[in-house]
Amino acid sequence: MVGSTDEGDYPPIAHREVLAWAFYDFANSGYTTVVLTSIYSAFFVAAIAGGLAEASPGLPTLLWTISVALANFFVLLSAPVIGAIADYRACKKRFLALSTVLCVLGTALLGFAGPGEVTLAMALVILSAIAFASGENLIAAFLPEIARGDNMGRISGYGWSLGYFGGLLTLGICLGYITLSLIHI
């Protein structure tokens, strides 16, 4: 049960902390759904790097895959270091705020990458994906602090379910916007 603990050594868990933690996933999941999985990835392959397909079919998809792979490889190497520093200096919230700001800025700047600007788009995708994944690692590190014992799975499930809802809501809004834009062309 949220607000209580099975272990007497810990203070009760505040509802607002659990909600804040879960709603971070709600707000954050639109990035993976829209940028990495569906809309921007297709836009990158078709429009930004699409001109390269004439010379080398499949190259736009390869460049997208390289961008995501480089970001994930960097996170693979940096996550243990970032986590150790965040734990040692007790600055998880500051690192989480920084990763969030970098992800938002990197994502917003993607709008400035037009057809043919492959290097800019790749750099921004790499930056935003690194920041996103770093934020995911940092937000997950808060779970043991807001959940105890038998409620950890339930609280984690709240975050996952709100994340899926947030991702689908963001995707729906984006698809609606794209559809309306195409109607008015």
Positions of predicted regions on the chain:
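Hydrophobic core of transmembrane alpha-helices in multi-pass small-molecule transporters
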Residues: G106, E117-G135
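Glycine-rich segments within core transmembrane alpha-helices of 12-TM secondary carriers
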Residues: G157-L175
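C-terminal ends and interior cores of transmembrane alpha-helices
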Residues: T100-P115
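Cytoplasmic membrane-interface "Motif A"-like loop-to-helix N-cap segments
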Residues: A86-T100
